[in-house]
Amino acid sequence: MEKRIQQASKFGKVAVLMGGSAAEREISLKSGKAVLEALRSGGIDAEGIDVGRDLIAPLLERRFDRVFNVIHGRGGEDGVLQGALACLRVPCTGSGVLASALSMDKLRTKLCWTGAGLPTPPWLRLDSPDDLERCRQALGFPVIVKPAEEGSSIGMSRAATAEELAQAWERASGYGCAVFAERWIDGVEYTGGMLKGVPLPLIRLETPHAFYDFDAKYRADTTRYHCPCGLDTGREAELQALVLRACQIVGVSGWGRVDLLVDRSGQPWLIEVNTVPGMTDHSLVPMAAKAAGIDFQELVWHILETSFA
């Protein structure tokens, strides 16, 4: 059972870890600033720490009672930080080592979901250019090519021809991790947040881009977010149950966000799970929480409570 904390002093000294050295560093800094301001507004003794490649040194220099982690991507969302904090016996928000590591790796997440009978688009790992023809035969076109361990759609490309597939593989292979192609799903994109085991309202995403890429997420002013999502109550509840099951299968706890697509026939497809979603006041989890009647300050309080789990 999740613990409820009524007094700010019970949290003790809180380190808000942000930044990191991954490609999502700037987004993490924005998330960290928003979280820090909200925690302090709630009377919590919190200190922001801009972490570089050395995640541990700042925590050894000063004593903290717990960590609010908003480092996105590698180093902060992949189990590395979670393992280090476990060794230091410093409680942290969100998922533990195993769930963080699994969720950061999109390929292994898909393997877990497939093994549990959950729907995720067919895919093929691309280890070299020699796999591209096999990809064409197995998946057809179009496909979306992804680095397995990057967030915010970094390194992703849609490919509708053999030439585009080769270019997409070249781009994705530059991120130092496995690369895979996934069958393109023509449909509507949703994202579903989870807070302490309870689903948040779904958000429907609408963008003129080919897909919800980095520009659509952080730069474009043409992206539209619909919450309520427009589905009837029963259908939304079905997708929310799928979101919770997707989290459960990979062990995500505390809070997180699952991205999914619903094709033209109504079939849902799980895409990925985020264990440290964006936390600016314009990010998706805060947006969904607001629709559920939870303001930003209350949201960060609830997330910090997950460090007691």
From Swiss-Prot:
Report the family membership: Belongs to the D-alanine--D-alanine ligase family.
Q: Is Iron-sulfur there in the keyword field?
A: no
**Any Pfam family matching the protein:** Dala_Dala_lig_C
The EC number(s) attached to this protein equal 6.3.2.4
What name goes with this protein? D-alanine--D-alanine ligase
Pathway per its UniProt entry is: Cell wall biogenesis; peptidoglycan biosynthesis
Q: Which organism is this entry from?
A: Methylococcus capsulatus (strain ATCC 33009 / NCIMB 11132 / Bath)
What is this protein's function per UniProt? Cell wall formation.
PANTHER family the UniProt entry points to: D-ALANINE--D-ALANINE LIGASE (PTHR23132), D-ALANINE--D-ALANINE LIGASE B (PTHR23132:SF23)
